[in-house]
Amino acid sequence: MLKGGMLSRWKMWSPQYKILRNHLINFKSVSTYKNISGVNTKQPKSPRQFGCMPHVTKKRKYKYEEGKTYHGFQCERVEHISEFELTSYTFRYERTGTELWHIDRNDSNNVFSINFRTTPFDSTGLPHILEHLSLCGSQKYPVRDPFFKMLNRSVATFMNAMTGPDYTIYPFSTMNEIDFRNLQHIYLDAVFRPNLAYFDFLQEGWRLENKDIFDKQSKLVIKGVVYNEMKGAFSENAQVFSQNLLNNIFPDHTYRHVSGGNPLEIPKLAYNDLVEFHKKYYHPSNARIYSYGLFDASKTLALLDEEYLSDQSWVDNSYSLIRQQERWTQPRLVHISSRLDNMGTTIDRQNQIAIALLMCDATNIQESFELHVLSEVLIRGPNSPFYKNLIEPNFSGGYNQTTGYSSDTKDTTFVVGLQDLRVEDFKKCIEIFDKTIINSMNDGFDSQHVESVLHNLELSLKHQNPNFGNTLLFNSTALWNHDGDVVSNLRVSDMISGLRESISQNKKYFQEKIEKYFANNNHRLTLTMSPDEAYEDKFKQAELELVEQKVKLLDEVKIEKIYERGLILDSYQKAESNTDLLPCLTMNDVRDPPKWPKLFIQNVQNVRTQICKVPTNEITYFKCMFNITGLSHEETQLMPLFCNVISAMGTTNYNYREFDKHILLKTGGFDFKLHLIEDVRDSKSYSLSVMINTHALNNNVPEMFALCQELIKNVRFDDSERLKMLIENYISYISVGVASSGHLYAMLGATSQVCDAGKLKSLLYGVDHIDFMKNFVHSTSTVDICDKLSTIASKVFNKDNMRGAINTTQSYEPSAISNYEKFLESLPTFGKTQTSRNIHYLDPSCQQYVMNIPVNYCAKALFTVPYLHQDHPTLRVLAKLLSAKYLLPVIREKNGAYGAGAKISSDGIFSFYSYRDPNSTKTLNAFDETYKWLRANQNVIDQQSLFESKLGVLQQLDTPIAPGNIGIDYFLYEVSQEDFESYRSRMLSVTIDDLQCAIENYFGKESMHYGKCILGPVNANLELETSHKWIINN
């Protein structure tokens, strides 16, 4: 039997760029953060975008009855959603009014979350810093940073904490009930009884401290984890633009503040203000509690009653209510500045514009849903009016990240934003926006275009999401926070039916909506942004002046106290915590993951085909891969662009508008991805393949294969104007937001110094790809690019270099195979070409990508052994141990970076990284001193830390898999169920002696093949401070 699903989740990151026409990105705020090892998390999607299409059934036996009380919780509402076999129970604790929403569902991935409505009244980042501090120790668990320590004492599939613009949530999920109860205790104690220690405030929030804490003569600077995090956030232009849009469209409101914290305002926060805020806003009366899955909810109710709520009483929480924004009588225009992005386009085009409209109250569920659909009709794909009028004229780099409909705030918003346009085109954009609204109001929409949007929504609801409980939580949080009806919000099929009926009865239904919400809406903000070459200098000067103002208020005694406090904090950070106070799973608590359905390998018309018969909710998933290793170097470098544009160019029989309409009416789209796959057995070779991924309802499978055949046989690259627009949008898209994923780009940059396969990865996915595309487009005419892509298309889709995979239901499998055979009959065959290349390893090297940002992203990569080597599981355990015991304490807690860690990829690249880091060479030195630290702290590697590190690996290995992705590891890497089980068994058998041997073998002497990389500001002393020669990429 073959196993599918884990390896692809943790292999070296390979970003696959998609043009924004394929999906809408909701209006985000800078104020949504992830509190795990540093990676920024996007705001949850609209509550209308999750997988449920329910039907309510009245008569059935329920576990809890309406009107009855269980452990102090009265059951107020019970509803069954039959299509997803879940039952919703709404409870309210009688003493405090705390609402608990339990979703009972036969799903092994159980979820729990405590939510609070936390409305900021300034931009000091108080709710965000409190989120960090709450997880730094509590009454029952007085351990420094139990949250991070629990990461490796649990097999949680998800652990997090997030601050939104008006809420803070603390969610986790796990498939193990003992783990679930352990984490419930940790989270509940953290939020209701946190220690809120002053020195944790200094570490996580902000502090004034000597730059060198051991030198009292060194200058005073501002430090702090959140402070550095927000410096990083405010250096990202997309974040700055989104945050200002939120602040300015709600100017009289809590949303005018930055809940995450403006770095120049954070140092105004006083510790006592944070303590008082917790008392008020983290009161149980202001809490909402969510649980999901198959674990017994009565145990949760009993725990809350007995340990946290019974000694509390109700308080009026109206102080946290979010009122509606008062509507404007006149539209407004706001202009802001941003940093010059040296990764971006030319300075004259580094401008952005957004036109935003305030829509309806988010709690008006049907109205909000219909506006969401209308928004998709207006902006989605080449058949939408805004795409036709704003994107296709090609005076910008396409939609920006704010575009779309958002229901994440009390009043919903609709935004159309463009990036990379000239200042003189701002006026043109506004005029086109107005004209498009008027024309849409007068002319209406093509009925097939509307139907394609609704079909795509209905198809998305059929997906079986392995993280359904988390998805439901995130998509309900904002609505629930505004006291909206989250249960009725699950009735998406009813909302779709209601909309269809309204449209059938009134052909101008959408046109009337446009008149009301778009044409006659004075609450309209036009936000523009342009680069300022002095932006970073101005920030540095403002930061310097802020420090100077604070220093002026200090006498010598206070300065001495700051120095002494820094030493005390250093000792506090180095002190050992009694982690025995924290719960931890034992090996007896760890269960084997479920075995996945058998994979059948068949030869279908000489094409190796993998078939998995599994319940898929009436969807058939199809993947096929074409080996393209034989392409030339230039053709290979063009493959990411090829994958991005191929389904947007049209075919011999359909122009691009017609083809897009057919795709959306019959399938979930065609996703082309480029895969560089190393041999996981010996790392001596690699191959390149392009994978096509699509899915459709079973009754649309014939059309799915027909459209796929049409695309790969008849794609046209003869429309040079169309391609020019797509290329410019693509370059804008990949150039924006490099810093937000800076640690990933840094790891790719470091890996590119290790071997030629790593160098190719950087050319295909990294900063080097951005540079290549800019230079290539500058030196090559669009007509020539058309010819090159057309040549690639004639080479890529070779049946002799193909393999396929089908996941479908057992009953539909014969029909799926029959349609697949017809698809294969027409594919061209022109003999096998080169299928692999040998890997060559390089001499050690270091490089920096210079970015004008105030933080760094550092990485070091070295070659070890690949996935199926016997030492790989040991090194993976070691990576977890180093992250928890060395890198996070030193680089995050002590030195102030937002995140740090170590990981090993399937090809054997062992990487160290930091995220939003105030340091560069100091961090690289910490990476280099790993062996020295391990030898000096051998006592750290004990049985408990070893076991905890294994649990951290199990979290990744045992992650649930969607039915459509079962078998993916075998399809990509030929890692079988037996291989996986052997790997898992070897990992669990790793001993302390194994770790010590691995330390000596792979870190005891400097690796022959390693690379270092920094993304960050200029450092004139880089070579002097590191004693290495550096390649500087400006």
Swiss-Prot record:
SUPFAM superfamilies: LuxS/MPP-like metallohydrolase. GO terms for cellular component: mitochondrial matrix. Binds 1 zinc ion per subunit. GO terms for biological process: protein processing; proteolysis. Residues 1-29 form a transit peptide. Keywords: Hydrolase, Metal-binding, Metalloprotease, Mitochondrion, Protease, Transit peptide, Zinc. ATP-independent protease that degrades mitochondrial transit peptides after their cleavage. Also degrades other unstructured peptides. Homodimer. This is Presequence protease, mitochondrial.
